[in-house]
Each structure stands twice: as structure tokens, then as C-alpha cells.
Amino acid sequence: EKGGHDGEIKIGKFCLITPGVRIVSAESIVIGDACMIAHGAYISDADWHGIYDRAKPVGNTRPVVFEDNVWIGDSAIICKGVTIGKNSIIGAGAVVTKDVPPNSVYAGNPAILVKKLENKEFNTRANFLADPIQLAKDFDALDRYSLGGNSLFGWLKSLIMPDKSN
């Protein structure tokens, strides 16, 4: 507890939060199921100091909510008091200061509506991860594809006589 504030962060199932994401809370941040947050994104529910009283810790706070299947682009900033609606996308580098309705794409500084998404079924991370046996098969197939053409001879050659091709 700092300055009388207990921050709380709740993260739903099947979320992808990449390295370099900062989520800081003095009040409440709720991230729904199957959300994706890209590198460098910053999410905060507080000002962290007052405008005129910069010695006072935390400042104003308002909860942040991501509904299910939200995608936050690289280096986006989500400010206090924002709710991002289900299936919405926030573009890379966007600064979001106001609520984003469901099925919307917002980008820019300040973030504005770029596109309305069709109201149809989304294939989410929850679908992708629902069947672990199929997921393992998919990863095996991906490994076979990525490593195709590799051989023991090629590996030994790369150790003994490396060139630009390896």
C-alpha cells in the first residue's frame, strides 16, 4: 500500500502479454479473457502525482477495463479511466484517453476511430488454446516446416566452414 491506495490487477484466461509491457495500478486494472498486449504498451489507472501538488503520491485514479479479446498494439498508452470494448484493437503508438466501444479499431495521438469491425465471430486465443492435443500437433507441424531442409551434414558444415548461408 502506498499513500492509502491498494492497486489491483486482474488478468483473464488465455492472455498474451509480451515482454516490455508495463501495467501499473493504484486502484484497479481488469484485463478480460484472450487479450493480447504488445511490447512497450503502458497501462495505468493513475496520474501518479497531482498537477499542482507534485509531491503528493498517486494523484487522481480511475479504473481501467479491457473487455474480452482486446488487442493492444506496440507502445500504445492506455490512460486512467478507459474501458476498451470487446474485440477492439488499439494501434501501435496510440494514446487512449477515452473509452473505446466494442468492435472498433482506434489509433493515433489522441486515439480516434479508424475502423468499425464487422459484427461476426472472432477466432480468439481461447479457441487456439482450447485443445492442447491439436495445439501440440500444430506446433510439431510448424517445427517441421521451419526446420525443413536442415540436416546433420549442414549443421556440421556450419560449424567447420561457416558462410553467409548459415
Model-identified regions with their sequence ranges:
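Flexible, glycine/small-residue-enriched loop-and-beta-strand segment within the central core
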Residues: 1-82, 117-118
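Short alpha-helix at the nucleotide-sugar/activated-sugar donor binding site of glycosyltransferases
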Residues: 36, 88-89
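Conserved catalytic segment of ABC-fold P-loop ATPases
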Residues: 85-88, 101-103
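A generic "structured core" feature
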Residues: 67, 89-91, 95
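Conserved active-site beta-strand element of glycosyltransferases/polysaccharide synthases
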Residues: 106
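Short beta-to-alpha loop/turn elements within the nucleotide-binding domains of ABC transporters
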Residues: 82, 94, 100, 109
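Short arginine-rich
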Residues: 98-103, 133
